[in-house]
A protein has these predicted regions:
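Conserved hydrophobic/amphipathic alpha-helical signal-anchor segments
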Residues: 28-78
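Low-complexity, acidic interaction segments enriched in glycine
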Residues: 58-203
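A generic fold-level signal
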Residues: 2, 39, 142-145
Length: 203
């Protein structure tokens, strides 16, 4: 007569499986997040190359997409949205081959037409010189970051407005935790923006 498992033995097996899962799952999720961060930085590098190529041909960086300047700008509730389709650097000249580049960490708080649902882009010179010349943020930021900057919401999946002004976002720093507040940025003068930055860690 074969003897089956006792209840205690089954509970021990279940407990062992639970312990192994508790160890493996967080490590898997952390590795997945690190992989997405690497992908974001690679995509930002590709976009940066396209922006610089556009600037060489046109003597200026692309304008911000939410100005509605480009035909075919994507719309949400009748308003142009920045960055869903990179028309300016994909049409009519294809500085990038894929105009549908999306942020792996898309903003989970899409509540208004001007919230970003993919990588954000700032024409820093236009903001500093034409739009907000009296701002305490944009002119110094233009001097620090150069003519443009690109950004991702980062692993916390939201643009973090916790700085001295609503125009500034916290920088993502993996030493604060793989999933921690902060955004991933790349700019003309900073190939991979890392803390510290102007305005007490704001960007």
């Amino acid at each position: 007569m074969k003897k089956g498992f006792t209840l205690i033995e089954l509970l021990i097996v279940v407990a062992i499986i639970a312990i192994l899962a508790a160890i493996a799952v967080p490590n898997f999720l952390e590795a997945q997040t690190r992989s997405k961060v690497s992908r974001v930085k690679a995509d930002l590098r590709s976009l940066a190359t396209a922006i610089e190529a556009y600037a060489v041909d046109n003597n200026r960086v692309p304008r911000e997409w939410n100005t509605g300047q480009y035909p075919g700008d994507p719309q949400v509730n009748g308003q142009p949205v920045s960055g869903i389709l990179w028309w300016g650097i994909s049409t009519p000249i294809a500085y990038i081959t894929n105009p549908y580049i999306r942020d792996p960490f898309q903003d989970k708080n899409l509540t208004s037409p001007f919230d970003e649902v993919t990588f954000t882009y700032h024409d820093m010179k236009t903001r500093a010189v034409d739009w907000f010349p009296s701002s305490t943020f944009w002119p110094p930021a233009y001097g620090f970051y150069g003519a443009w900057r690109l950004g991702s919401v980062g692993p916390d999946r939201r643009y973090t407005h916790s700085c001295p002004s609503n125009s500034a976002q916290l920088l993502y720093d993996p030493t604060n935790g793989t999933v921690s507040p902060g955004n991933i940025w790349r700019s003309q003068k900073n190939s991979d923006v890392q803390p510290p930055a102007p305005l007490n860690g704001c960007l």
